[in-house]
Amino acid sequence: EKTFLGHTGDLNGDDIIDIIAKEPATARFICRHLYNFFVADEVQVPAWTIQDARDEDALEMMINAFEESGYEIKAVLRTMFNSDFFKNARYSKIKSPAEVVASTLKMVGSYQTPEPTIPDIGPESTYMGQSLLDPPSVEGWYTGQEWINSGSLLARINFVADRVANTSLPGISAIIGHIKSDGVNSPEELVEASLEHMGFLEVGDETMSQLLDHAKAEGNMNWNDEAAAGTRVGEMLALVGATTEYQFG
């Protein structure tokens, strides 16, 4: 016979898990982790005991689903994925270095089949602060804004900019083709199209002004010179990739 968290009896491993699952702190801990992973960046885990959740109402909804379902994770996920707070959470998570690398390569169409140079990509996330399969501790990596510092930000910007400006890559070539076929001509249209193709990005007034100033310096698009027009599109995509809104959302 043993006592665990106030429960005494002939307890086995399953009993211990059941007792832990029914603790109020368990529901909050699990649901806050799920919110942090799928919805929006939270403060780091060590601060959870002293700082409220980013969205207490959302967290309470998830906790209720967990408890009312008999402690089923799938009920929490169903509630979360069908919720308005999940559907409305855009640009609420900072990409990890692995996500920056993978999403960029997917967008530009690199490495669609196995290639000898694939191992060369591995260190890129390390330069941004995430050595794959080698977390700093059993706790894993601190996420959210912890991914960003002066060194990692430069590495992130350079990785994205170098690739989206490469008009020979199939994904970028396709973007240029779409922009051309859509009849994009004015600097304003070029900026809007570039933001759309980089993820329907919403930027602030200051960022928009800077992008427009750059686009207006070269006037309207000249699609008669396809190489120059493509280069111009690539440059604009690279500028978008360097914005605060892209890197922090």
What residue ranges belong to the model's regions?
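N-terminal module-boundary/linker segments of secreted carbohydrate-active enzymes
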Residues: 1-2, 17, 235
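Long, well-ordered, tryptophan-enriched scaffold segments
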Residues: 1-13
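Flexible, low-complexity segments enriched for small/polar residues
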Residues: 23, 27, 31-69, 77-249
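A Trp-anchored, charged/polar loop motif used as the substrate-binding/catalytic surface
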Residues: 12-19, 23
